[in-house]
Amino acid sequence: MSGENRFPEELLLNEPDRGHRLIREFYENYADIARTPDYYTAIRGQHEKIKTTFYRRWLERNAHDQRSLGLDVGCRGGVLAGMIGLIRWIGVDIDDAALEVAREAGLPCVEMDFTTAINFQNASFDVVMTNEVLEHLPYPAITVREVHRILKKNPGSAYVGSVPLDYHLHRRWKVMRGKRLSGEQLHVHHFSFKELDQLLRFYFNNVEYLPLSGTAQRHPRWRLSYNLFVRDIAWAAASPKSEPGRWNVRERF
């Protein structure tokens, strides 16, 4: 091969974990625990209390107890796993500072970059939780597929979590005025309810939702569209499908 056509391999950076490190540093800078020391432990608002009650009732309904093993993906300081209790929880997170807080709270946890893969064996867990996590990941469809893979294929096996919904009327009005759907820099995926619902029902036979904020949450009797009138939503899904097939990545929402 002539010198003109040779790829300049000497320019390549030999740092395999560079992406992992950059993401970890980004989250650590965002947390800035020197300025906000309670960042990993504070319970802000009522969402967490409402969600944990919802999750716990769902797990109790599906006969989970201390014999069940749960994975908290993006566990931060381990607060929600501690609030839910009921089962044996372990956690993973990319943020070292968060993991230190979680360990002090008694949650067994390790550092893991789950941006594209959740590195556990097939059928390892009875419960998986991704609370306010999917919106931070570039390909949620891959993450949910990984959740399905590591869950045991039992009727009571459960996947619980929550996300903001960014296509409600208020956010649409923001876009019409030239603003972003979300001002949160850490949010890289913006869910509509339709997308979330189709994704969860593709992998699970039983899905239940709990609106956390928005007009539909304040006025449940009005039976308003979740796609337009819910800002934040929690879910509990059970009965993972044994052979869900392949998710259509060309689907348009």
PLM-predicted stretches and their roles:
Residues 82-85, 180-184:
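Short glycine-enriched loop/turn motifs at secondary-structure junctions
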Residues 158-183:
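Conserved class I S-adenosyl-L-methionine
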Residues 1-121, 127, 141-144, 161, ...:
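Conserved N-terminal segment of class I S-adenosyl-L-methionine
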Residues 127-133:
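A short beta-strand submotif of the Rossmann-like class I SAM-dependent methyltransferase core
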Residues 168, 186, 191:
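A conserved catalytic-core signature of glycosyltransferases
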Residues 141-157:
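A short glycine-rich, Lys/Arg-flanked "PGG" loop and its adjoining helix->strand segment in the class I
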Residues 139-140, 172:
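Conserved catalytic-core motifs of eukaryotic protein kinase domains, centered on the activation segment
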